Amino acid sequence: HIYHCLTLAYNLTGQEILFVTKEQHEPGLKKLQEANMPVHTIKSDEEFMEFVQEWKPDVVVNDCLNTEADYIKELKKYVKRVVTIEDLGEGADYADVVINALYEDHTRGDNYYWGSNYVCLRDEFFCATPSVFHEQVQNIVVIFGGTDPSNFTKRIYEMAKRIHKDYPEIKFH
């Protein structure tokens, strides 16, 4: 999420940008500081609302998964526009804009923007050489970004071990 938000911030040059994050999110906080981005730390959602009331931003870009309706409604009392990213929670229905680049749904409101047309790519990816497409699958890599609280990695690994017996020519990494 941090890299996504940094990419967005880099592309909003000329705008006053401030990152607000919970102080316990140390790796993300460190990355923002390394990127020389202005950062304000908070301890709770309540403290965030107090900060927003005081700072009075024009737009809040909220990169939180599964927001609750009450949270977004409260935020909209103090902010002109609320944008949420990768948000499938009920709160997203109350945001002004929802950008869900990782999902292809299209069944929710007009404030939703779905799919790969809305991905924020870092500059490094524009320079990358596309991989050669192989008709025959030879290698499979499964990567879940960030944390894995549902232990999907282990579940996928166990499935790959079972599949590998039927397809010994495929390498799982």
Q: What are the language-model segments listed below?
A:
Residues H1-H4, H25, H40, H106, ...:
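Histidine (H) residue identity feature
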Residues H4-N11, T21-Y112:
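Active-site and donor-binding regions of nucleotide-sugar-utilizing enzymes
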Residues E16-Q24, I170-H173:
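Short internal beta-strands
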Residues L75, G91, F133-H134, K165:
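Generic structural signal for beta-strand residues in well-ordered domains
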Residues Y94-N151:
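A nucleotide-sugar donor-handling region in carbohydrate enzymes
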